[in-house]
Amino acid sequence: MYQLKARCSGLADLMAKPKSGNGISATARSAVRKIVKYDLFGYQDFEGNKYTEKGIALEEQAIKLSGRKRGLALKKNEERRENDWITGECDIYIPTRKLIIDTKCSWDIGSHPFFSDEAEEKAKKAGYTIQMQ
């Protein structure tokens, strides 16, 4: 029997509240449909763009800088972790410290959050706060 398994990066969409009433939101319904299409047929409507390409290209540098700021020698996590309901692959995982870090690279100076409240708001809006729980 098929059992849906969500990616951590998609949890915010799955947990979106409906605009009115109770039940499942249109955003959550759409997210479930995307997961099922991928699981059953390998279909994915988003395969990246210039923003994700830049993030991938700068990922190693972002990990090194994150480590420098924390005084740690960090390296890219290559292991996907999962349980019965969710799956995900974080950028950095340090089990001895119970530390998970997911780096993000801004596209340009206009999209970079310079202030902590701005960074927190962007993370919340993008669903990263749910993803990292």
Segments (PLM) and residue ranges:
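Charged, glycine-rich intrinsically disordered N-terminal tails and low-complexity linkers that flank
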Residues: M1-A57
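Mg2+/Mn2+-dependent nuclease catalytic core
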Residues: D45, K50-I56, E60-Q133
